């Protein structure tokens, strides 16, 4: 990947984060996520990163892909960043296990 930061660059970064989450959460249960602070931090960081990169996509790109819940991605980042100590791990777990794989399929 070159250093040109355009829509393709940001989509590749988003895909990398989504794939990382899907691979590393594959066999993880809620109890393991709850007990593993390093795993929590890693997953939350990836969720923040994919949201940050989604914000950098052009409006044209996002409008062409209206089925992707862009606003939900931005809201996710804001909830994590602004209320980090009070993030509901049940909601995070459901997002990681259900929404993230669906989003990856939508973006592929």
Regions flagged by a language model, labelled:
Residues 1-108:
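Solvent-exposed interaction patches of small proteins and small membrane subunits
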């Amino acid at each position: 990947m070159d250093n040109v930061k355009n829509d393709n660059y940001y989509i590749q970064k988003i895909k990398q984060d989504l794939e990382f989450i899907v691979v590393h959460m594959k066999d993880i249960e809620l109890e393991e996520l709850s007990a593993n602070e390093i795993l929590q931090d890693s997953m939350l960081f990836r969720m923040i990163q994919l949201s940050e990169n989604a914000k950098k996509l052009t409006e044209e790109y996002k409008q062409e892909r209206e089925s992707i819940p862009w606003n939900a991605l931005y809201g996710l980042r804001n909830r994590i960043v602004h209320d980090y100590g009070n993030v509901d791990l049940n909601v995070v777990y459901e997002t990681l296990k259900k929404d993230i794989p669906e989003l990856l399929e939508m973006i592929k």
